[in-house]
């Protein structure tokens, strides 16, 4: 038998056999690192051979406040030796100070025959966290020092079930998580430079015959230990030393045993005044009180501020000016000394979600988003820091979507052109697409603006007349405005010969099969009007032509084509009809890559128009349905979740259009993939979103076991090289574009999205995690900071 350490009373005594020596050393280092137990108060005792514990050594066990027994295979074998077992039964008593740690063995009912108090011992395993080891020792020491009231859970002596005992131990463990929960400090705020008496009320009884001390441990200076005076058996008083401002931890020692810990705060006079003013001038509470919002409600304040800002914004909004304004000359403006430098920072700090969504549509939104406060935080990180993770996600996705729109438009327009003016002009045409499709889907302006060009009977200045009508004009002006809107809406929904949105279908229905319908009779001479009919087009050959094009040519063929108008279904367009209608739509000289994307309001109008054509609804009912839909959209737009859904819909639509553009010119069922490198050492990055807690799938292929007869005679390097240079093809489904595909499967791989460079400048590969030791769990973040350097040793082998 071997004992290491100094003689006297010990806080922790570790009983182990030779096969658990590494675990004994690990526990000693762990306890010393926490500063709760001093070095000369830890003792280790190794049980050797089949020798019983002597009477002198039994006194060592009796004077120890807690005993940890490492149950390894070698130690358990000694239980079958009667002299050793009898000495252990005397040494491991009383049961409240014994902690058993299963180290390579499992629990069973046979141990109850060896020790009658087996189920009263605290139980630990090799895969527990270090905090569990510390808490078990602190609990045993507290009970041994007379602090019986640390936990109110009574020990049930008659329980013989393993599961019932584990449940009781879990309850005790939860009730004694921290000794700091059982302390009351008055006062807990101390003025610097002022002599202050601090009173500490304990929940456990203190011994008046033992010296009690309080140790103050500031971060930037050495610890100060002060002798405390015992006011009664539960209360002590101590003169606080003069320390600098900040939070100072303190520990209470009864003799050499730490019986509690807590913290106090030192502050200067100015810091105290600042704290009082900050509590009294809370901006949210102040505004709730000013606007008479009782009880205080963030949601009500958010709604009120959002509506107030909307009233001061023009009806058509400010999104026509874009949100991409950035400061390029003076970059120092991106760093401010204020905590909340902009209104966007303020709304993100206090979780004003609707106000944040509205501010993101105002000019300069990206510039405000790029400004860091004095702590280096941006609006999105401020929102997450204060617990508004959904708001953080919305801000990130909104900024990324705006960047996707800008990048995609520029990529479309700058193909083969160097004129930046073309891009600048085009940017103004699609700058409000984000607003129309995400935050304001039911706006009147974009609907009536789109209808004004499609209604043949409308005058040229109809939309201008509608916008120029003001509320401060006489009542007749409002009536005229309402009449104009209703008239346009009715003519649009009547469809028939006009068929506004489906321009290609309207040509075929309005003018029929007569190719010269658009030619006026009195305009041209008679001989031109009586010309012979146009020859019938030749029918297409029914016999399929042999496809002599090479396979590789199909894959790499690039067809320069513009996206088609999404309002016109491909199956309804007559390719032989080339004559334009009399009143043609005004065509812009600038190509708009998003011109065919329908907003929610346009899709609703098209749906109602189709129902009117089919006779399901009449025009009056369709008008009522549309107005009801607009009212419902206006109410729903006040919901933050509704805005999130619309933003996601727009992002999916843009992604589908980008994917379709990439696949244009290629065969519909062929796609070039990245060469596959066959290597077991390939490092991969799990496919996991920034807001998700786990990867979507395992990127590493399952290991293939080698079997007899499975060896290859080829060279490994040549096989890998040939496989890495070979391209694979796979079948893919065609992806439809446009926002009208609400019922489509919008599952787009997150890895295929091009993330905006604004929220994250670079994607960094995560550092490789250390190898997990066999049968030893990973050490999580719950480990104390000062314990990170200690790793548990491997578990001893099981006994046979």
UniProtKB/Swiss-Prot annotation:
* UniProt effect for mutating residue 448 to F: Fails to bind PIK3R1 in a BCR-signaling dependent manner
Q: Which residue windows does the record flag with biased composition (Basic and acidic residues)?
A: 702-713
Compositional bias of kind Low complexity: 714-737
Q: Name the SUPFAM superfamilies on file.
A: Toll/Interleukin receptor TIR domain (SSF52200)
Is Cell membrane a UniProt keyword of this protein? yes
Record's compositionally biased regions (Polar residues): 749-759
Q: Could you tell me the keywords of this UniProt record?
A: Cell membrane, Coiled coil, Cytoplasm, Membrane, Phosphoprotein
Where is this protein primarily located? Answer: cytoplasm
Q: Name one GO biological process term.
A: TOR signaling
Coiled-coil segments on the chain, per record: 643-663
Q: Which GO terms describe its molecular function?
A: phosphatidylinositol 3-kinase regulatory subunit binding; signaling receptor binding
Can you list the GO cellular component terms from the UniProt entry?
cytosol; membrane; plasma membrane
Q: Where is the DBB domain?
A: 185-321
For membrane topology, the record states: Peripheral membrane protein
Q: Which residues form the TIR domain?
A: 8-145
Q: Which residues carry this modification: Phosphotyrosine?
A: 266, 423, 448, 463
What's this chain's function? Signaling adapter that contributes to B-cell development by linking B-cell receptor (BCR) signaling to the phosphoinositide 3-kinase (PI3K)-Akt signaling pathway. Has a complementary role to the BCR coreceptor CD19, coupling BCR and PI3K activation by providing a docking site for the PI3K subunit PIK3R1. Alternatively, links Toll-like receptor (TLR) signaling to PI3K activation, a process preventing excessive inflammatory cytokine production. Also involved in the activation of PI3K in natural killer cells. May be involved in the survival of mature B-cells via activation of REL.
Written domain comment of the UniProt record: The DBB domain is required for dimerization.
Q: Give the quaternary structure.
A: Homooligomer. Interacts (phosphorylated on tyrosine residues within YXXM motifs) with PIK3R1 (via SH2 domain); required for BCR- and TLR-mediated activation of phosphoinositide 3-kinase.
Q: What is this protein called?
A: Phosphoinositide 3-kinase adapter protein 1
Q: What is the lineage of its organism?
A: Eukaryota, Metazoa, Chordata, Craniata, Vertebrata
User: What gene name does this entry carry?
Assistant: PIK3AP1
